[in-house]
Amino acid sequence: MERGTASGGASLLKEFHPVQTLQQVENYTALSERASEYLLAVIRSKPNAVICLATGATPLLTYHYLVEKIHQQQVDVSQLTFVKLDEWVDLPLTMPGTCETFLQQHIVQPLGLREDQLISFRSEEINETECERVTNLIARKGGLDLCVLGLGKNGHLGLNEPGESLQPACHISQLDARTQQHEMLKTAGRPVTRGITLGLKDILNAREVLLLVTGEGKQDATDRFLTAKVSTAIPASFLWLHSNFICLINT
């Protein structure tokens, strides 16, 4: 079986693809339930899939449902590789607000994953070499099969922040003022002004992309995203260029 494909070369999520890319759901619970089914379908279709995961409130219930289904249905996860989409810079990885702690608590530990099943940025060692290390690890695995994302309040994707230009590759980013007020950073005890993130090229190279749009304070970013006009002012708008892109939206 080729990377990122089911038997016969079909999309891993083909059975879920509607005529349109956009799927509106009634509430956060329904969105999370459907997203977990997508994830489970990918895992069943390709047991050694490489799946990039966003963190935070948006995908939290999705991951809870996914873990629940995996245990209930006794799905083998021993060959999976998960990739951390981004991380705050200059915070110890063990702090409560880090993306590392989030994934450890909601994916790695509940599923009993081995250490080598998570490709992760090390926030204590952030430099361009760290970008290269993570990029190379993903490449050795054959690239991303699925990237699970959330829409930021300012339209960011991962920590690819709005601006006059965007960096395609994995990079260290200067955080937008709104991102610096992120819920996850409320326990940091210090200002956090930088992040490290996979770039838009890394995301768009994934075989499948699943975007979750839900949460308070995102109406403006959602409205601008839904125009389907690609702009560096809304990094998430670049997902409209992807051929296997599904957006679940609860507005």
From Swiss-Prot:
Pfam families reported in the protein's UniProt record: Glucosamine_iso
Gene Ontology CC annotations of this record: cytoplasm; cytosol
Disruption of the gene: reported phenotype: Deletion of the gene does not affect growth on N-acetyl-D-galactosamine, D-galactosamine or N-acetyl-D-glucosamine.
GO molecular function, one term: glucosamine-6-phosphate deaminase activity
Keywords: Hydrolase
Keyword hit for Membrane: no
Domain of life of the native organism: Bacteria
Biological-process GO terms, alphabetical: carbohydrate metabolic process; glucosamine catabolic process; N-acetylglucosamine catabolic process; N-acetylneuraminate catabolic process
KW Hydrolase (keyword) present: yes
Gene3D superfamilies documented for this protein: 3.40.50.1360
EC number: 3.5.99.-
Active site: 86, 154, 156, 161
Family: Belongs to the glucosamine/galactosamine-6-phosphate isomerase family.
PANTHER family from the UniProt entry: GLUCOSAMINE-6-PHOSPHATE ISOMERASE
Protein known as: Putative deaminase AgaI
